[in-house]
Amino acid sequence: MAGEIPDFQAEVRTGTGKGAARQARREGYVPGIVYGGGQEPLSINVKYNDLLNRLKKGRFLQTLFNLKVEGQEDVRVICRGVQRDVVKDLPTHVDFMRLRRTSRINLFIHVTFENHDQAPGLKRGGTLTVVRPEVELEVTAGDIPDHITVDLTGKQIGDVIHIQDIALPEGAVPTINRNFVIANISAPSGLRSSDNEEEAAEA
């Protein structure tokens, strides 16, 4: 059920205070802290380039990580803040929060579509237009779905698929409190042109 959680490597940071943090930055690291989960806070260093690459991929604050620190047990964490240099806008500090398996968190979950060959609308030349390739859901940290599935069986041209049309995994709840659109099946351009011509003739 749960998707593969990406690893994030870190090292224990020896020393505390601004001096230790400055030393870490000089050595190519970004200082950070791991807190929560009923344990003592842990000072860490993460490689600057690793963090920067993760940030560039986007949705860093919505991604669950498996934090690996030498000498420590692996722990699931989510980033709760990235401090940046006010001039260069580059990361200078990062905060991670430990999560229990029962913790509730918001994550973007990928949407997959199945049974394309069972959709009459697609067989007639219609196009599946995906409005939301990912959906933000509130989920339990110990049971994160890899994806949610949209069954296209029986879908016709003009059909619109809303979030309430999808069977969500147990315990997963959309963070947006409205029946938003996931996808639709639009008519092929030739059919749309034909319809427009008929409407013009009737007018």
Curated annotation (Swiss-Prot):
Pfam families, sorted: Ribosomal_L25p, Ribosomal_TL5_C
HAMAP family per the UniProt record, alphabetical: Ribosomal_bL25_CTC
Gene Ontology MF, one: 5S rRNA binding
The species this protein was found in: Cereibacter sphaeroides (strain ATCC 17025 / ATH 2.4.3)
Record-linked Gene3D superfamilies: Ribosomal protein L25, beta domain (2.170.120.20), Ribosomal Protein L25, Chain P (2.40.240.10)
A GO BP entry: translation
UniProt KW keywords: Ribonucleoprotein, Ribosomal protein, RNA-binding, rRNA-binding
Cited function: This is one of the proteins that binds to the 5S RNA in the ribosome where it forms part of the central protuberance.
Family per similarity comment: Belongs to the bacterial ribosomal protein bL25 family. CTC subfamily.
Stored InterPro entries: Rbsml_bL25/Gln-tRNA_synth_N, Ribosomal_bL25/Gln-tRNA_synth, Ribosomal_bL25_b-dom, Ribosomal_bL25_C, Ribosomal_bL25_long, Ribosomal_L25_dom, Ribosomal_uL5_bac-type
GO cellular component, one term: cytosolic large ribosomal subunit
Oligomer status and interactors: Part of the 50S ribosomal subunit; part of the 5S rRNA/L5/L18/L25 subcomplex. Contacts the 5S rRNA. Binds to the 5S rRNA independently of L5 and L18.
Protein name, UniProt field: Large ribosomal subunit protein bL25
